[in-house]
Amino acid sequence: MIDRLKKIQEKYLRIEDELAKATASDTLKNLSKERSRLTPVYTKADEYLKITKDCQDAKSLLESENDPDMHSMLKSEIEEGEKKLEELAKELEIMLLPPDPNSGKSILVEIRAGTGGEESGLFCADLFRMYNKYADKKGLRVEIIDMSQTGIGGYKEIVFSLDDDKAYDLFKFESGTHRVQRIPETESGGRIHTSAVTVAILPEAEEKEVEIKESDLRIDVYRSSGAGGQHVNTTDSAVRITHIPTGIVVASQEERSQIKNRDKAMRVLRARIADQAAETAKLSADALKKAQVGSGDRSERIRTYNFPQGRCTDHRIGFTSHNLPAIMEGDLDELIDALIQEDRSKRLAEAKA
């Protein structure tokens, strides 16, 4: 481990040096992101190497020390140092796991109503509100890209972006089917209905990551029915883009400007094309699938929200909270932390196997 930690130190210092010399904005951005990623492990590695040297120095002194009090003090110092090294080694094991290739990326979130009719659409709106509140607590900016509303305050679908380097790491375990059990407001008999909503987390893809030919696109413009007042209903500001080779269709209508809506739709298109390629690759990566918390499959039922019992259960890790009202208000830290810890444990076990 010592050699590996020294290499990390060297890499970090090299990045610091390159940052001091860099002038191009893209280079500065990439170097800053890499430094930010390495800083925690560099700090921990520095502490580990320092304590290792202190222990070695104390052992050398112990061999030639005849004074009983000094001998006892050095022995105690070595024991404390070795205990601390054990703790640091466990932390470093986790920190040195291969990073998720999408870590540090902004994301697009798609929430779609599934089975359950109007009740599913209402829960789609509830999930968006929950994520919006959680994002706000974490300082993430939510930007709506497209939405299709139902007549009673729900959504058939809503797509939004979270533009922050913490976004993917916080939301990556939300992909899948979310099931809700509750008595609908429209239900006169008081019967519990079960509905479902699907969530897709799409890491944002940069233009250089996904090549899209203009000739492969069919672009349609139409009058928006979204936010923005009367203006959006009197001009063809909404944009729908079809990627002919894959059949992927994306849309954006939340901006007054057709150009801005086109840019937003292209962001979604790039993310979906990249996601489709990743899903194809994932089918042949069985070992990687087993190392993750759940498969991230859209059809996988990951969580149940039981309103009559005030209970939320994540089926992938057996996590249950009996404080559903707080969760629906965006208090997701305990749940997401549990998912992150379980994922780390599985990846660590896989690395040692």
UniProtKB/Swiss-Prot annotation:
It comes from the Bacteria. Gene3D superfamilies: 3.30.160.20, 3.30.70.1660, 6.10.140.1950. The modification N5-methylglutamine is found at Q230. It is found in: Cytoplasm. Methylated by PrmC. Methylation increases the termination efficiency of RF1. The keyword Cytoplasm applies. GO terms for molecular function: translation release factor activity, codon specific. GO terms for cellular component: cytoplasm. Keywords: Cytoplasm, Methylation, Protein biosynthesis. Peptide chain release factor 1 directs the termination of translation in response to the peptide chain termination codons UAG and UAA. Belongs to the prokaryotic/mitochondrial release factor family. This is Peptide chain release factor 1. It comes from Leptospira biflexa serovar Patoc (strain Patoc 1 / ATCC 23582 / Paris). The lineage of its organism: Bacteria, Pseudomonadati, Spirochaetota, Spirochaetia, Leptospirales.
